[in-house]
Amino acid sequence: MAIFNLKKREIECKIVYYGPGRGGKTTNLEYIFKKYSKQITGEMVSINTEGDRTLFFDFLPMGLGKIKGCDIKVQLYTVPGQVQYSATRKLVLRGVDGIVFVADSLEVRREKNMMSLKDLQKNLKEYGLNIFKVPLVLQYNKRDLADEGIPLMSIEQMEKDLNRQLKAPAFPGSATKGTGVGDTLKECIQMTLKALQKELQWAK
């Protein structure tokens, strides 16, 4: 749930990058941190867990105007994808306003993607949130690895596995090269702000 800071005239939204372990969530955030450094306030905080990390930092989206005369600040988080960090993932989702689900395009990761999406749905439900109503964007990461002859799933296959019911916006990407990273983030921020404006109108 977005936080209103009336003193600073600021609205803070929280966007979480979710998905299977080693799928590219951290790489997405690291790319954003480097590429959009002028729009970032403060440092990137990294909490190391064995074989994975939880990252977060504040991002100021430019050119998106104001809501109710307030500036917008977005907090970007990743969650550790490994199965054993279920409690951490659930904790990071608390108060979430928008989600980027980073799916791994490698053929061998097909099951992991589907399990992670189910895990997301379950954790959201425990907070009283519906995966079909939360602003959600999918990114099909590691598309560049096809050039190296590594077997990838087709976009059609990934859409069928993950997005047949959700019908969420989806972007092919390569987080290491930055392909699709900005588009994914921009779409998620816009969807999140639209949902927030709707919420505020209901609250009048």
For the regions a language model picked out, list residue spans one by one.
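Switch I (G2) and immediately adjacent beta-strands of P-loop GTPase domains
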Residues: 45-84
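Conserved beta-strand segments of the P-loop GTPase G domain that flank and frequently precede/overlap
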Residues: 76-78, 100-104, 137-141, 172
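Inter-motif core of Ras-like GTPase G domains
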Residues: 86-108
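Canonical P-loop GTPase G-domain recognition
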Residues: 144-202
